[in-house]
C-alpha cells in the first residue's frame, strides 16, 4: 500500500526593500549550498537547499539624480549597514548550518545508514520469541490433553474398580450363603446319623425282646408238663411255628434294615454330592475372589500411579504457565522500551524538522533581502526612493510544500518545494 502526502507551509510575511543600484559599486557573487538528511522512526527526509548571496564592498558615491540630498545619503548608509549586518547573519547562519549538518551526520552515523534504524535484530528476536511461545503453547496443549487422557483413564479405572468391588461383594455373599447351606447339610447329616443309631438300637432291643418272649414261652410249655389228648386233628409243631415267626420277623427286620440302609445311603450320597458340588463351587468362588483381589490391588496401584502422574502433570503445567508469564512480562517490557525509543526518535526528528524549517524561513528572508540589496546595487541609475519606500511596504509569503511517499506505513521518499509569493 503506497500513497503520497503533500503538506504546504506558509512563513510569516516580511518587508522587502526596493531595487537600488549605485554606479560605483562592484558586486561579487558568493554562493553556498547545504544538504540536510534526517530520519525519525524509520522514515527519511532529504532536504537540499541552494542559495546565492551577492555581497560586495559598497563604495561611497553619490546617488544619480538625487541632487546630493542628505536624507538619501542617510538612507543609503542605513541600507549599507543593514546589508553588512545581514551578511554577518548569513555567515553566522552558514556556520550554524555546517555545525548542524555535522551533528546530523554524527547522529545518522550512530543511528545507521540513511537515517533508517535497523530493527532487523529486534524483529528476529520477536520472531524467535513468537516461535517459542507457539511451541510452548503446543506443549501446553499436549500436556492438557495428557491430563485429560489421564483423568479419563482414572475414571475408567474407578468404574472398573467399582464394578469389580460389586462383583466381589456378590461373590462373598454367595460364599456366605453356600457356607450356610453346608452347615445346614452337616446338621441334617448328623440328625440322620443319630436317627440311624436310634433305629439300630431299637432293632436290637426288639430282637432281644423277641428272643426273651420266645424263651419264656418255651419255658412255660416245658414246665407245664400237661398232656392233653384231644380228639382233634394233629396239632401243629410249635417249634416250627416259632421258627416261621422268627423267620418272618427276621425277614421283616432285614427288609426294614435294607430299606433304612438304602434310604440313608441314598440320603448320605445326595448330601455328599451336594457337599462336593458346593465345595467345588466354594473353591471356584475362592479362586475368583483371589483373582478379584489381585485385580483390585493392580487397579489400586494403577490408580495411584495415575494420580501421581496427574499431580506431576499439573505441577509441570503450573511451572510452564509461570515461566511463560514471566517471559511475556519480559517481552512486554522490551516492547514498551522499543516503543518509548521509537517515540523519542520521532519526537527528536520532529524537533529537528521544526528547527530546520525555522532556519529555512530565516534563510529565505535573508536571501530575499540580499536579492533586494543586490538589485539596489545593480540598478542604481533607475533607483527611486519613493519606489524603494513603496516596495518596502510590499509583502512576501514563503510557500513550502513537502511531498512524502508512504509505503506500508513507511516514508520512502520526500521532496520539498519552496516558493516566494509577493503581494
From Swiss-Prot:
Pfam families: Filament. Expressed on the plasma membrane of hepatocytes and in the narrow apical portions of supporting cells in the vomeronasal sensory epithelium. Detected in the type III alveolar cells of the lung, in the proliferative crypt epithelium of the small intestine and in the older intragemmal cells of the tongue. It is found in: Nucleus matrix; Cytoplasm, Perinuclear region; Nucleus, Nucleolus; Cytoplasm. The record marks 231-232 as: Cleavage. The modification Phosphothreonine is found at residues 295, 397. The modification Omega-N-methylarginine is found at residue 46. PANTHER family: INTERMEDIATE FILAMENT, KERATIN, TYPE I CYTOSKELETAL 18. This is Keratin, type I cytoskeletal 18. It comes from Rattus norvegicus (Rat). The gene is Krt18.
Amino acid at each position: 500500500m503506497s500513497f503520497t502526502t503533500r503538506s504546504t507551509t506558509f512563513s510569516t510575511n516580511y518587508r522587502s526593500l526596493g531595487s537600488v543600484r549605485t554606479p560605483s559599486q562592484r558586486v561579487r557573487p558568493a554562493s553556498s549550498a547545504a544538504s540536510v538528511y534526517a530520519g525519525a522512526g524509520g522514515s527519511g527526509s532529504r532536504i537540499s537547499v541552494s542559495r546565492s548571496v551577492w555581497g560586495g564592498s559598497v563604495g561611497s558615491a553619490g546617488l544619480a539624480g538625487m541632487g546630493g540630498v542628505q536624507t538619501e545619503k542617510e538612507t543609503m548608509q542605513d541600507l549599507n549597514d543593514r546589508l553588512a549586518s545581514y551578511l554577518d547573519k548569513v555567515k553566522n547562519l552558514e556556520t550554524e548550518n555546517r555545525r548542524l549538518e555535522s551533528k546530523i551526520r554524527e547522529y545518522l552515523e550512530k543511528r545507521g545508514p540513511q537515517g533508517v534504524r535497523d530493527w532487523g535484530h529486534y524483529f528476529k528476536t520477536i520472531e524467535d520469541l513468537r516461535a517459542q511461545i507457539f511451541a510452548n503453547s503446543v506443549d501446553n496443549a499436549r500436556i492438557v490433553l495428557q491430563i485429560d487422557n489421564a483423568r479419563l483413564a482414572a475414571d475408567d479405572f474407578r468404574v472398573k474398580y467399582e464394578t469389580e468391588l460389586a462383583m466381589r461383594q456378590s461373590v462373598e455373599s454367595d460364599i456366605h450363603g453356600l457356607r450356610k447351606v453346608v452347615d445346614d447339610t452337616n446338621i441334617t447329616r448328623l440328625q440322620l446319623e443319630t436317627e440311624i443309631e436310634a433305629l439300630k438300637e431299637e432293632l436290637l432291643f426288639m430282637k432281644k425282646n423277641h428272643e426273651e418272649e420266645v424263651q419264656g414261652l418255651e419255658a412255660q410249655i416245658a414246665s407245664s408238663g400237661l398232656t392233653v389228648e384231644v380228639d382233634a386233628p394233629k396239632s401243629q409243631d410249635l417249634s416250627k411255628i416259632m421258627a416261621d415267626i422268627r423267620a418272618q420277623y427276621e425277614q421283616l427286620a432285614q427288609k426294614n434294615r435294607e430299606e433304612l440302609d438304602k434310604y440313608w445311603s441314598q440320603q448320605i450320597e445326595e448330601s455328599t454330592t451336594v457337599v462336593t458340588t458346593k465345595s467345588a463351587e466354594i473353591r471356584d468362588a475362592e479362586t475368583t475372589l483371589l483373582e478379584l483381589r489381585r485385580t483390585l490391588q493392580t487397579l489400586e496401584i494403577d490408580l495411584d500411579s495415575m494420580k501421581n502422574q496427574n499431580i506431576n502433570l499439573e505441577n509441570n503445567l503450573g511451572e510452564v504457565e509461570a515461566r511463560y508469564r514471566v517471559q511475556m512480562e519480559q517481552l512486554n517490557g522490551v516492547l514498551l522500551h522499543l516503543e518509548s525509543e521509537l517515540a523519542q526518535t520521532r519526537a527528536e526528528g520532529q524537533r529537528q524538522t521544526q528547527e530546520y524549517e525555522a532556519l529555512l524561513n530565516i534563510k529565505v528572508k535573508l536571501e530575499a533581502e540580499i536579492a533586494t540589496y543586490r538589485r539596489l546595487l545593480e540598478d542604481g541609475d533607475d533607483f527611486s526612493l519613493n519606489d524603494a519606500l513603496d516596495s518596502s511596504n510590499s509583502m512576501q509569503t514563503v510557500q513550502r510544500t513537502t511531498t512524502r511517499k508512504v509505503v506500508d506505513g513507511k516514508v520512502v521518499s520526500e521532496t520539498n518545494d519552496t516558493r516566494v509569493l509577493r503581494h
